[in-house]
Amino acid sequence: FLREMEFNRLLSSAISAYGQPKLEGSKNDDQNLEKQQKINNKNYYLIDDLGQIDKWIKEAEEAGEVVVDTETTSLDPHQADLVGISLCSKIGKACYIPVGHKSSKCIDKNAVIKKLKGLLEDPSVKKIGQNIKFDFIILYRHGITLSSMEDTMLMSYVLDAGKNRHNMDILSEIHLDHKTISFKEMVGTGKKEINFSEVELDKAKDYAAEDADITLRLYKKFLKNLKLEKMVNIYEIFEKPLIKILAFMEIEGVEIDKMFLKSLSSKFEKKIKKLEKEVFKISKKEFNIASPKQLGEIIYNDLKIAGLKKTKKGSFATSASVLEDLAFKGHEFPKLILDWRQVSKLKNTYSDALPEHINPNTKRVHTSFLLAATTTGRLASSDPNLQNIPIKSEDGKDIRKAFTAKKDHLLISADYNQIEMRILADLAEVKELKKAFKNNEDIHSLTASQIFNIDIKKVNQDHRRKAKAINFGIIYGISQYGLAKQINVSNYEAEEFLNSYFAKFPEIKVYMDSTIKFCRKSGYVNNIFGRRSHFNGINDKNFNVRNFQERAAINAPIQGSASEVMRLAMIRLDKRLSDQNRSSSKMLLQIHDELIFEVPKKDEKVMIKLIKDEMTSVAQSDYHSFSTPLTVDINVGDNWGMLH
């Protein structure tokens, strides 16, 4: 939840305080499925002759399914070299085809690709993988377009989102009671670490063939569990189609202005130096601002601007939340530290780091979209993470200006307007909100008029600002203290605002209470479309853990439903672009409620209409009909910064 909400600064302390989720699988996993065959390498084969591949192809065609797993020189699918391919169509029997090892026994890579192309592109044979999007990109770069893909990672995610992570090692332990051969065992660590291409073939065979074997076993289990849990539709409708769509978005990448980022780094460096001077002027001595220990000594011992506060480990408390509390009380020093941290992060994480992500071949940045990283179904991104670029500050907005359209093209931003508020109105059956959305009223002004008990025509900017904070705060389970800090009022006033809000919109309070009650009983919540988000700590004895999980449970159906709407929109748009043969217009990025497209300038008007039509039509889909309309804000520009 912290990661999804972009509360990244709290993530480390939350894990430290409460630990990682326990490893547990879906309830029907071991009770209703046959005992698995013992896992060993007895029938794992190393292919050292091109002709041997034929019988594996035949076996796959007869089975109608085959696990495909690639081994590579790196985890970057856009630059990695192919080292080998493993195949498995029968539990306990798998092979490994080495094509890029430093060994004379390797088979010619091009010959292997040519041999496997027919099978791997055959739509009548299922291609099963664990995070198969990675393998899709690797093989696509080698001239193979995988078809009919299945993904055990996504199957696990649909079944157990929020219960555990979904990487193969963990899934094997949970569902198969088997500890896999680790990647570290193959390549080592530290100074002794080698590339996978240097691993001995027999060892590589056991590792790669086991991966394929494990994947097939997991696939068989998850397929049955999806049926037992009645979750097949979530997997088939919302997960599988996104594999290829996101893969092509990643392959396309986005152009960034390297020189502009360089100038930003210079600008940020000057800001950092200026802030440091102001900090040292107050502290009356220089110190390492990045050191929590040294910073704590200044705050608590030298300046004495707060009573001594320490973490559980006994160190000085200098987290963002602590500094925000002190800044809220009027202290200048912690505010300067927060500003210094923000500018330093922008420089280190974005303006300095983004150029390092430019692919030397494509000259573009290729993020990785993560389908199974959140509890709610919301997408995430990494390497680089393009979903957490700050937008509230001017400096954060400047980072977005570095993302540009290529020559003779424009960027189009399509952003769902207040989608989570619309979904809340739909979920909780809030009559006043649904009416306001249907009449295209300003929802924040309406809320202000209700909670401040004034005519909507008399609502001023301050009223609206506070109402907006309450509206969005409710979605994320904001506390009265959190609201007080956000809108700069007393705790008492914040409590009164919340009480007034629930009095005017009682359906929302009913929704919140009933959602928590259901989650306490079942351990999960459902979104509008039926996806489950599990919350293991909803009944925890620790108040802080329980309270945090309750807020997350309230938010999950809202955020999850919004994510599903976005997934459906992406699927529709991909089909529409394909049907109309608009290959020159590309879907580049998905940033929460926003899609970014790169389109030819000549197609601007046509594409705006096409995008808007498809995204708004999701409101009346075969899977759910919303009682509130979905609206989309469209912006066009030469760079991402111009779109906001």
Question: What label would you give each PLM region?
Answer:
Residues 1-100, 147, 163, 171, ...:
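Conserved "right-hand" nucleotidyltransferase catalytic core of DNA-directed polymerases
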Residues 407, 418-457:
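Basic, low-complexity segments
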Residues 145-161, 168, 175, 440-444:
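Conserved beta-strand -> loop -> alpha-helix junction used to position metal-binding or nucleic-acid-contacting
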Residues 67, 124-132, 411-413:
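Acidic beta-strand-to-loop metal/phosphate-binding motif
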Residues 274-277, 281-335, 503-555, 598, ...:
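C-terminal polymerase-core module
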Residues 194-197, 244, 251, 359, ...:
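Conserved catalytic core of nucleic-acid polymerases
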Residues 90-127:
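Nucleic-acid-processing active sites and adjacent nucleic-acid-binding tracks
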Residues 75-76, 85, 133-144, 155-159, ...:
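Short active-site loop/helix that positions an aromatic residue
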